[in-house]
Amino acid sequence: MNTQSKQLAVVLKDLTKRFEDTEAVASVSLEVPRGQICGYLGPNGAGKTTTVKMATGMLKPTSGTAVIDGFDIGEYPLEAKARIGVVPETGALYENLTPREYLSLIGHLYHLDQNEAEKKAETFLSLFGIADASDRTMTSFSRGMKQKVLISAALLHNPSVLFLDEPLSGLDANTALVLKELLRELAAQGRTVFYCSHVLEVVEKVCDRVVILNNGRIIADGNVEELKDLTRAASLEGVFSDLTSTGDLSDIVRAFSESVTGGKAE
């Protein structure tokens, strides 16, 4: 492993995924250094979640490679996955388990010391404000409570790379603020965050770099100020609209409004 590769946490090279006649991700190449929070944006169906699934070993690419901390996830899946923490867009929990039982299982899968795993789990659940529910099955949990358990599971083994797909989904404002500050702290410690979201205001504030995907291809890559200069937009929201919109937004809004009201002014 050369010096440059030691500084790169994520290396995607010509990553491609085809589903029958549809190319969901087309030759995506991307290098993310250690300690960076990289926002990965795109419209619905752009290929963001498919990219994350390939990068984390949950989906086999049609072609191309994903390397995590120097380990090709296709050739060395155990070594690569041991370094990854994932919060998926639609995370599935074993809801018949309690949070304590679920996190104990996650700790076992990562070969953590049982006492250490239990102590960390207890701390996470307490900090997330759900310690009083730690011994209740998760069948009746709200979306936000489940999300807190998923985030705890992703952090439990102290991963060097975090893949987060809409991580703030369902979280209350205070917890979302804590998580955003935590991500900055982890990045300052050298961890890498691959952050997928549609909440552009958060991405603009949190991410060091923004990559925009459309129709399975990278169409922009830079920090927020560079992307604003590129499009002469005032915000990341404006950048995103300029680069990915298929029509004039005001015309689209007007058409929706007329459809809702039947063309009648209120």
Give a label for each model feature.
Residues 64-72, 80:
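Conserved ABC transporter NBD signature motif
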Residues 104, 108, 115-133:
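Conserved ABC ATPase "signature" region
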Residues 162-166:
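Catalytic Walker B motif of ABC-type/P-loop ATPase nucleotide-binding domains
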Residues 203-204:
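A short, surface-exposed alpha-helical micro-motif characterized by mixed small hydrophobic
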Residues 221-222:
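ABC ATPase "signature
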